[in-house]
Amino acid sequence: MANRNVPIPRRQLYIGGEWREPVKKNRIPIINPATEEIIGDIPAATAEDVDIAVEAARKAIARDDWGSTTGAQRAKYLRAIAAKVLEKKSVLATLESLDSGKTLYESAADMDDVAGCFEYYAGLAEALDSRRMTPVNLNSDSYKSYVLREPLGVVGLITPWNYPLLMAIWKVAPALAAGCAAILKPSELASITCLELGEICREIGLPSGALNILTGLGPEAGGPLASHPHVDKISFTGSGPTGSKIMTAAAQLVKPVSLELGGKSPIVVFDDIDNLDIAAEWTLFGIFANTGQVCSATSRLIVQENIASAFMDRLLKWTKNIKISDPLEEDCKLGPVVSAGQYEKVLKFISNAKSEGATILCGGERPQHLKKGYYVQPTIITDVNTSMEIWKEEVFGPVLCVKTFKTEEQAIELANDTKYGLGAAVMSKDVKRCERFTKAFQTGIIWINCSQPTFNELPWGGKKRSGFGRDLGKWGLENFLNIKQVTEYTSAEPLAFYKSPSKN
């Protein structure tokens, strides 16, 4: 087991390149979801702290040491941060697991991905220098035009607790690469590693105010950030109701937002798959990785009727083989959910499904060997109909619901029977069928013969109530750039639109 005695640093808010105590001096306890014990606390920012952070960010943009940097100069900072993350990987991964309940294996993988994301956007920052000014050919000899790509300005980044540092970096890295000054507001349920990012930025000498980190409650810190008149954009990942509130606040100022709001993603399994075990493992990974706390989790299994019995038998055996334990234990593959509130929410979904007539095929309660912690067994629910809550609503926990189908048309109808549109997966060796499903799925992300692989180079985002805008890839960088048209009149001839006045 990893060392659970790693000390929890007692940080303040990271504003203007230094640690600052919150104006109201309040703090929020940190609860280890594996033990239910308080292991530390984080500062609780309020509107007053948001004002200070916004001012620090605006000063950073106005100063030459950040506001006038080239992409190549910003890339050096991003690469320095990446190197520090890898240097501190072991401690950061342990802190992440203690804070959020993620398995240590997943937390360590997240740190590799964090460093990789900074490296990726360092490359895009360098490439931005040659793209900053792009000439545009016009059908006119009298004008010369070009397009400028410029940083949007001060951006607010509000991020979730399920991948605390990684999903923060999906926004921080491109924002800094673009030359924006950012204010990061992570979830109060898991903020430790985001605060440690502040220490890393201090250590590598990131110009003050380029990145500011405010921990605290959503209404007290996130709300004032979203509605602040001097914040030029909000990028948010989280729940639908909170996303709606952010849109409402931003709308008053006609402020741009990008939103990633979760989903109820399907995985469709056809009878022509070559190997039941391969398909079963991908199905499990799609819903039980990160304890099911994944916005794109393929939480609805739609399996062809004539293989359903055999496939479910294999799926059940794989599920019962998952090691559930303290997330710091070696080979742990499923830890606790993040909080008491999330624990009660997941169990309520399971209870409601049973009350509505569904069958709890396996799981559905606390593992018997774990008396403390917010643990929920990996759960598979069958005999589900499309009117049930468990079919329609995002659980955000280790819960898979199952339906069968006979025809492709039925499978598509079931797959798209959701208000969300983030991800979808299809398992089949028929290439043409996979192409048909790629076109038919009403989602922003499609996986063929897999579920959940994620790459820095590819766009991440959805349709319908899963939100709009894209993280990652070149699209993630464009989120934080403003396009400015510049046109010059180059002819010596007068415009000749108005009648020239007499010279007398």
Curated annotation (Swiss-Prot):
Binding residues annotated for NAD(+), in chain numbering: 159-161, 185-188, 238-242, 261, 394, 460
GO process terms (BP): cellular detoxification of aldehyde; glycine betaine biosynthetic process from choline
SUPFAM superfamilies named among the record's database cross-references: ALDH-like
Enzyme category, top tier: oxidoreductase
Gene3D superfamilies xrefs: Aldehyde Dehydrogenase, Chain A, domain 1 (3.40.605.10), Aldehyde Dehydrogenase, Chain A, domain 2 (3.40.309.10)
Pfam families according to UniProt: Aldedh
Site positions for Transition state stabilizer: N162
Catalytic activity: 4-aminobutanal + NAD(+) + H2O = 4-aminobutanoate + NADH + 2 H(+); 3-aminopropanal + NAD(+) + H2O = beta-alanine + NADH + 2 H(+); 4-(trimethylamino)butanal + NAD(+) + H2O = 4-(trimethylamino)butanoate + NADH + 2 H(+); 4-guanidinobutanal + NAD(+) + H2O = 4-guanidinobutanoate + NADH + 2 H(+)
CDD domains noted in UniProt: ALDH_F10_BADH
Pathway(s) the chain acts in: Amine and polyamine biosynthesis; betaine biosynthesis via choline pathway; betaine from betaine aldehyde: step 1/1
Catalytic residue positions: E260 (proton acceptor), C295 (nucleophile)
InterPro entries linked: Ald_DH/histidinol_DH, Ald_DH_C, Ald_DH_CS_CYS, Ald_DH_CS_GLU, Ald_DH_N, Aldehyde_DH_dom
EC code: 1.2.1.-, 1.2.1.47, 1.2.1.19, 1.2.1.8
Similarity field: Belongs to the aldehyde dehydrogenase family.
Subunit structure: Forms homodimers.
Function: Dehydrogenase that catalyzes the oxidation of several aminoaldehydes. Metabolizes and detoxifies aldehyde products of polyamine degradation to non-toxic amino acids. Catalyzes the oxidation of 4-aminobutanal and 3-aminopropanal to 4-aminobutanoate and beta-alanine, respectively. Catalyzes the oxidation of 4-(trimethylamino)butanal and 4-guanidinobutanal to 4-trimethylammoniobutanoate and 4-guanidinobutanoate, respectively. Catalyzes with low efficiency the oxidation of betaine aldehyde to glycine betaine.
Protein name: Aminoaldehyde dehydrogenase 1
Organism of origin: Solanum lycopersicum
Source species taxonomy: Eukaryota, Viridiplantae, Streptophyta, Embryophyta, Tracheophyta
Gene encoding the protein: AMADH1
